[in-house]
Amino acid sequence: MILGIDEAGRGCLAGSLFVAGVVCGEKTALEFLEMGLKDSKKLGPKKRFFLEDKIKTHGEIKFWVVKKSANEIDNLGLGACLKLAVQEILENGRSLANQIKIDGNTAFGLNKRYPNIQTIIKGDERIAQIAMASVLAKAFKDREMRQLHALFKEYGWDKNCGYGTKQHIEAMIKLGATPFHRHSFTLKNRILNPKLLDVEQRLI
């Protein structure tokens, strides 16, 4: 059994960070690949929410989704929030899996305590359980930003999902930040450096 872990919302200017973990075996993973599972960034919202529902209701899958709010990110820092969320998933899921695979290139120093952790760059494209975790995290993030968009329509959160797009930054300059913005994420560099904006828009 493999425990796959991924996140959504790491680079956002607004809203929460979501980290998800999914445990299942090879047979179930294959079932989802046949349903069209892939990295959540390559799925449309309709397919993503469809797969989210299938993951959550599948009898052979265990999953966890941990939310860290903008306020927690401001108070603790993004790195600490990521580590705490991953650790919470590991505490819940490690006894069910003989392999732990995390998307990216860091185990946040947790590989000393959990020696069977493997970090995999672009893991959401290579490991089904990481792709499933990616789908859950992104679906939770999308849903949150759609709900917040109903309160603050000017920021375009239903489209940009909290990332620093041109429209989002222009709205922040004009209207200021909301209580759901990460105030520790300075906008100064993004406004002065259009290249950063281009990179962030490609991440959406």
Swiss-Prot record:
Cofactor(s) required for function per UniProt: Mn(2+); Mg(2+)
GO cellular component: cytoplasm; ribonuclease H2 complex
Comment on bound cofactor: Manganese or magnesium. Binds 1 divalent metal ion per monomer in the absence of substrate. May bind a second metal ion after substrate binding.
Keywords: Cytoplasm, Endonuclease, Hydrolase, Manganese, Metal-binding, Nuclease
Cross-referenced PROSITE patterns: RNASE_H_2
CDD domains associated with the record: RNase_HII_bacteria_HII_like
Pfam families named in the record: RNase_HII (PF01351)
Positions with a binding annotation for a divalent metal cation: D6, E7, D103
InterPro entries associated with the record: RNase_HII, RNase_HII/HIII, RNase_HII/HIII_dom, RNaseH-like_sf, RNaseH_sf
Catalytic activity: Endonucleolytic cleavage to 5'-phosphomonoester
UniProt-listed Enzyme Commission number(s): 3.1.26.4
Signal peptide: none
One annotated GO molecular function: RNA-DNA hybrid ribonuclease activity
Subcellular locations according to the entry: Cytoplasm
Residue ranges of domain RNase H type-2 in the record: 1-197
Principal location class: cytoplasm
Gene Ontology annotations of biological process type: DNA replication, removal of RNA primer; mismatch repair
Family: Belongs to the RNase HII family.
PANTHER family for the chain: RIBONUCLEASE H2 SUBUNIT A, RIBONUCLEASE HII
Described purpose of this protein according to its UniProt entry: Endonuclease that specifically degrades the RNA of RNA-DNA hybrids.
Protein name from the UniProt record: Ribonuclease HII
Organism: Helicobacter pylori (strain Shi470)
Gene name as annotated: rnhB
